[in-house]
Each structure stands twice: as structure tokens, then as C-alpha cells.
Amino acid sequence: MRKHPQTATKHLFVSGGVASSLGKGLTASSLGQLLTARGLYVTMQKLDPYLNVDPGTMNPFQHGEVFVTEDGAETDLDVGHYERFLDRDLSGSANVTTGQVYSTVIAKERRGEYLGDTVQVIPHITDEIKGRILAMAQPDAQGNRPDVVITEIGGTVGDIESQPFLEAARQVRHDLGRENVFFLHVSLVPYLAPSGELKTKPTQHSVAALRSIGITPDALILRCDRDVPEALKNKIALMCDVDIDGVISTPDAPSIYDIPKVLHREELDAYVVRRLNLPFRDVDWTEWDDLLRRVHEPHETVRIALVGKYVELSDAYLSVTEALRAGGFFHHAKVEMVWVASDDCESASGAAAALGEVHGVLIPGGFGIRGIEGKIGAIHYARTRGLPVLGLCLGLQCIVIEAARAAGLAGANSAEFDPDTPDPVISTMADQVDIVAGAADLGGTMRLGAYPAVLEEDSIVARAYGTTQVSERHRHRYEVNNAYRDKIAESGLRFSGTSPDGHLVEFVEYPPDVHPFIVGTQAHPELKSRPTRPHPLFVAFVGAAMDYKAGELLPVEIPEQSSNGIQHRDSAARPIPEPAARG
């Protein structure tokens, strides 16, 4: 009798049916959080069926944000959900695309590694996918082997692009044994208002399509805008041949952070533990319950304007908005997002109309010239009125451009937006010149991943972090032109953090006697924020916005700089509260 290999790691696959955007990523993340709260070591992976090697060159309107990992991989935004819910860093191996798989297989064929075989989807493509799935079960850098690997399969069952991934998942179950693999299928149960009925037929057809390729789901997540009654759950269990304990109703939740509670109420985590024969421990809700109290019982509300190019699609700034909300959780405050198209702030009147009722302005990252003058206009409006500002990546560059113009360089600009500008205060990084000129590939060639920075001891950012040695993730090709540092400093702007060699500007800020809170970073700190451990910069920024709202940082018009570029204030900013300890 054939025996399956002994495996210490269990694999759980999450697929989707009927429609896209049902929340597979959040479902997988929430289940991962529940298993982690049971004391298990969980890691996660996303299989994306598109032919792009990574999402780095994709339009944010089509794909949403690009989430950058510590090791510099440009990945799907769901990887951000995984990191936030698991509260641990993942690597580039957490995201696998069809483009990566085919590129690797074709490269192997060119090297002659297939010994003359005809290269086919089965077995060569599926074997490459299986290898990447099984690699997630290897011990981490500390030697710890995961108890569970949760793998989300992108797309919808029935899509041509997803078929190799589903076949690879089926083969993993065949190779490791059914007792070591669990299939979770997320499906839509639509409500028809005219008849007042919930319809189960789409889910039945979706499961039938899954079974036709050899996969029988162990559990079903029923997505609906309301609870699915027990009678319908029994019907679905019968028609789809799934245990009734594995039919899970997941109505829309008030917050994404409520989803673990929804799944736990339906006992999905206990069912998974039982089916995979995992160690049984009670869920430790201590940290998550504290988070939910902060989410649902805020003491006040603060309005933050996000001035960006892609505000029509909130997923384009997903990590930013979650980091802002987490900063609010720290202060027991609700952050109300005000989405402002950067084009609306190009004129003084437009900026006043868009920003007149907010308590803080966030300028996120981005690329291209469209909307840049609006971002600069928003910064000018905020600077002259004492309104707190946090600039991320491109946001730092816009703060620098606005400061340079205030210091007398009227034509100051970035080489990205105006190659012929007389004062390129933002210039192309030396190792990016050929790439920008078109002499090398654009994809995967930016300054990516975690880099260290050194902060000045008495700076706002050092007080926020509680240290002068920090590491943040990056994604950029342009930098502050060091030839203009002295001139820009005449505006009062301070270069408060640099790379360890002092060459690359990583942080800028105005001292509190010049402006209450304008801070910019060349990094993307939002990528390291967690709902239970908010990032220090977002804690400080939301705190400054709350001060502004309370009138402690007076929302009065600040005069333009004098001839020496510096305008002092009599009042000082409130000390920045110490954020929770970060690992």
C-alpha cells in the first residue's frame, strides 16, 4: 500500500468562484490570524494568474497598489493583507505569477535542463508551481518550519489562466495526502431583491466546476450581504457534498478586522484544526479584542485628506489608508478619509475648497507628471496655514520642490516631470539614468526593498521613532539633488535623515518653530504598519492632526517666508507620544 510522505506542514488552498472581488485575500488573512492566535506558525502565499512577471509596471487603476516586501519584491496588494493580519514580514516568494513561472520554465528549457523533453503545461508548468508552493514549507531564517501554509489562488474557477494553478494544487494534495491538504472555496450567494430570495445555484455550479478538475472543497465560504439561513446552508452542504460544519456564512462585516470574529463564530478555525489534525489550543483574543475596541469605540474623529492621482480606486492606496487608520487606533480615534484628486489643488481656490475642512494632508507616492502641481499646491496651502502634512516617497519630493520655490527657485522641479528645468532639485539616481533613458528594462529595476537611514537626534522623526537608526522599504528612481541642499534649507526645511553615508536624503521636516508638522520620507513606511502595531510616523501624523483639530496647533494663516526664508512661530508642538514597541 502506497504511503504518503510524512509532512509536518499542512497546506490550505483558498479558491474563488462565481465572481471576483469576493474577499478571498481577506478571508485567507483572517483565517491565518485565527490560526496564529491559536499558537500555530502560519505563512501565506498568493498565486496570481496574470502573465506579468510582477505588478510593478501595471496601472494602479487596474491592479491597485504594489506592495513591496523587505527583500524588494513588488507583489500583489493581498500580500499586504497577509502581513498586517499575521503581523510578520513575508518575502518575495509569497507572490507567484504566471509570468514568473513561464519565464523560469522557458529559461530552463534554453539551458537544456529538460533533456530534450517536449515542454508542456503538464508536467513542466505545474511542477514549477508545485515547487514554489512546497518551498513555502521550508524552515525560515530562524529555523522554524511553518505549521500551515495558506495559499490563495487568484482569479475565479473557470478562468483559463487559473487552470494550471488549480491543477498544481490538486497534485499537491495527491502527493502529500488528503489528511495534509485542505481546500477552502469562497463563493457568492446573491440576494434577489424582487423575489426576496437568496440563490444557491451559482455556488452549486461553481463547486461543480471545481470538482470537474478533480478538487472537492473541504469547506465553503458563502459571501453575502446578510446571514445565510441554516436551511440554505444544509441545502448547499447536500448539493455540494460538503460537511455541514464546513459551510460558513460570512455576511458583510462593519470592518475588515471583524472578519476573524465572523469566521470564529462559524467555527471555521476549529474545523480546519480538526480536519488537518493540528494541535488544538484556544484562540488568544487579548490583542485582537483590544484592536476591535479601538476600531468600534473611538473617542473622536479626525479628517485626513489623501491628495493623489488614483483616488477613484481606493485600492491604489490600500496600505496608506490602513496605516492611517492604525495611527488613529493608537489614539483611540477614527480617521475619516477625504479623497482629493490632486488636480483639484492646482489653484489656491481649489486647494482651499478641497482642504478647508480637513485636519491633515497626506501626499502619497506615485509616478508621472499628471497631478504634480496639485500636490505641490496642496503642500503650499498646508504650509501657509499650519496644517499637518505627511509626504511619502513622491510626497517628500513635492515637499522639497515647494520649499525650493519658496526659497526663490521659481522654476524648481523634478527631472522626472521636466527634464529641462533650470533647477532640478529632484534628480535621477545615478544607477537609474540608463533605465530612464530606455536603455534597460523598467520592470523590477527601481531602488526596492529595505534600506537603513540615520536620523538627526533632535528631529521630529527621531522623536517619533524613538531611535536614530531605522530601516524602511523603498520604491523609487529619483532622489533629492544634493547640489541644492543648502539653497533649499533657506526655506527652513531640514534634512533630518539620510542614508548611512549621508548621500541620499531619506527624511525632511520643518522645525516646530517654522511649522507644526510637515514631514516627508523617501520611503514607504505604510508597508510596515500593522493594525496592532501602527507605524510611528503615522502615529505622530495623526496625533498632529488631532492637535490641529483641538486648536493646540492653531489653524491660523502663517505668513510667507521673509527674505531669509524662515518664519518662526511662538507656539511649540505638543510632544509626540511614544508609539508601541516595534520589532
UniProtKB/Swiss-Prot annotation:
Pfam families listed in its UniProt record: CTP_synth_N, GATase
Residues at which CTP binds: S20, D159, I160, E161, K199, T200, K201, P202, T203, Q204, K235
EC number: 6.3.4.2
Start and end residues of each Glutamine amidotransferase type-1 domain: 303-551
Gene Ontology cellular component terms for the protein in this record: cytosol
Signal peptide: none
Activity regulation (UniProt): Allosterically activated by GTP, when glutamine is the substrate; GTP has no effect on the reaction when ammonia is the substrate. The allosteric effector GTP functions by stabilizing the protein conformation that binds the tetrahedral intermediate(s) formed during glutamine hydrolysis. Inhibited by the product CTP, via allosteric rather than competitive inhibition.
Binding site for ATP: S21, L22, G23, K24, G25, L26, D78
Highest rank taxon of the organism: Bacteria
Region described as Amidoligase domain: 1-278
Residue positions binding L-glutamine: G366, L394, G395, L396, Q397, E416, R477
Residue numbers spanned by region Disordered: 560-583
Keywords: ATP-binding, Glutamine amidotransferase, Ligase, Magnesium, Metal-binding, Nucleotide-binding, Pyrimidine biosynthesis
Disulfide bonds: none
Pathway entry: Pyrimidine metabolism; CTP biosynthesis via de novo pathway; CTP from UDP: step 2/2
Cited InterPro entries: Class_I_gatase-like, CTP_synthase, CTP_synthase_N, GATASE, GATase1_CTP_Synthase, P-loop_NTPase
Gene3D superfamilies per the UniProt record, alphabetical: 3.40.50.880, P-loop containing nucleotide triphosphate hydrolases
A GO term, aspect molecular function: CTP synthase activity
Function statement: Catalyzes the ATP-dependent amination of UTP to CTP with either L-glutamine or ammonia as the source of nitrogen. Regulates intracellular CTP levels through interactions with the four ribonucleotide triphosphates.
Complex formation: Homotetramer.
More about this protein: CTPSs have evolved a hybrid strategy for distinguishing between UTP and CTP. The overlapping regions of the product feedback inhibitory and substrate sites recognize a common feature in both compounds, the triphosphate moiety. To differentiate isosteric substrate and product pyrimidine rings, an additional pocket far from the expected kinase/ligase catalytic site, specifically recognizes the cytosine and ribose portions of the product inhibitor.
Name of the featured protein: CTP synthase
Organism: Mycolicibacterium paratuberculosis (strain ATCC BAA-968 / K-10) (Mycobacterium paratuberculosis)
Taxonomic lineage from the root: Bacteria, Bacillati, Actinomycetota, Actinomycetes, Mycobacteriales
Gene of this entry: pyrG
